Amino acid sequence: MGGDSTDTPQGVGHGGGTEASHVPVLLKEAIDFLNVRRGGTYIDATVGLGGHSYEIAKRLGAPGHLIGLDKDPKALEIAEKQLMPTAGSSTALSPPTGDKMLGRNDKELTDWPTITLLHRSFADIANGQGPATIDGILADIGVSNLQLSDPARGFSFQAEGPLDMRMDPQSERTAEQVLNHLDERELADVIYEFGEERRSRRIARAIVRSRPIRSTAHLADVISAAARPMNSEQRRIHPATRTFQALRILVNRELDDLKALLEAAPRILKPGGRVVVISFHSLEDRIVKDAFREGEKKYKYFRVLTKKPVTASEEEQDRNPRARSAKLRAAEKV
């Protein structure tokens, strides 16, 4: 989940980018808060193109184990190349899931951890993990530029493409199906709740009147006509931004998956283990903040390490506009 839909027209992603322009967000801050222990076991719950994972792996060393999860099989293919860049690396496939176990055997980087790449949602982070077995969890939530930059994936309103929006192309429900089958009230509620769009009813009415809608460009045109910007804040972003965010969150169950991850984290973390979450819009950040606070105050299993969210420096924001809306929060298992 979520590239920021209020500040960045196309959104931002989890350490994402095209294969050629892979710039992880808040990289130093995330690695510092994760406090990687040599020889430990760590989970990158949103491995993306492997940017954060690579830095974790360098610190783990040969005794360590890094587990990388992602819904997107294309991202996993690229992450494999990023994490195993030399010809001497070895890859073993584990049928029928397509999950990959990677291990270094080249001479240059013999001090390299075992790396397991799993095609699964971070909601399933606890699957296969015993209680108190993990030293750290990193989750960089959101849609990646790999997904945004491919018109065929249907995430961006800036290019003509099918209304797909599935992070996992193998999942069943597309944005087109949702958009053309919800009634007007249900659609308005989705746009308001997941897009925080105040003009949700007006937009939903226009969508229903224009159905069937099959493409990103058609949907963007319908929204633009129904919700023209009236003030400077609205003019700062494309009128379709929040609606596209809402549909993407619904199709991919992003907030439910985030809640599942945060519920599982204290069970699988060792004492002293840390969970670090980077989010990109207020819905996600609120869920993380509340889960960490409740874990500290009510259940006593967390110590919150970030009383306020950590944000990118001006230098990083200038260098990487996707970082402008990123917020990092961290907690330690006690």
Per-segment meaning from a language model:
Residues 1-87, 99-334:
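S-adenosyl-L-methionine-dependent methyltransferase catalytic core, i.e., the SAM/SAH-binding region
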